[in-house]
Amino acid sequence: CPLKFIRLTYMDLTDRMLEILKADKTVVVLLSTHHRNGVGSQRAAMHKLLMAGCDVPVVLHRDFRETDVELLQLKSAADFGTLLLDGFGDGLMLHNEGCEAVVSDRCMFGILQATRTRISKTEYISCPSCGRTLYDLQTTIARIKEATSHLKGLKIGIMGCIVNGPGEMADADYGYVGAGRCLLYTSPSPRD
């Protein structure tokens, strides 16, 4: 059976609608909101679905009107990330009138990566650099990214000094730390 997508808001989740959702296993809810407190509205809707025993897939949907990409990233990460970290939502749908779809796509993949919902790229951890850094950190980061960006799912730490580096990249799969000469570390055991 093909899937049926139905766009709903918190106010649409009446007792009758909840019964319909429970009975039809081909429905995917596109949970939208235009409420001033959109996160609260979508969280309340998710709780209502849970309390009613509706085990339907839910795609969190938000509309934005941002021309500044960084502002879009901040707002959408705050709105979607909060819910995903709480375990709500099975997918994201971001619509923004102020930018191209590819920007929205990158933004959504970044949110999914940051919340560990879906890993789709290499993750990098780096320090901002300080007086203890004994090499050109920015150039090194660029070179490492160029050589490793295809390694989906890896976490790579790139630190400027041996003082804080190992601790700050403790959960990385690989680490690159400068100490006059650079030391390469690997995690002691495989990560999930």
Where are these regions (language model features)?
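Conserved small/polar residues in nucleotide/adenosyl-binding loops
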Residues: Y185-D192
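Active-site-adjacent loop and "lid" segments of alpha/beta metabolic enzymes
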Residues: L60-D86, L154-R181
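Flexible, charged surface loops at secondary-structure boundaries
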Residues: P2, L21-K25, M169-A170
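Long, compositionally biased, glycine/small-hydrophobic-enriched stretches that function as flexible linkers
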Residues: C1-Y10, T26
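Catalytic alpha/beta core domains of metabolic enzymes, predominantly
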Residues: D12-S149
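Glycine-rich nucleotide phosphate-binding loop and flanking beta-alpha elements
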Residues: E100, C182-L183
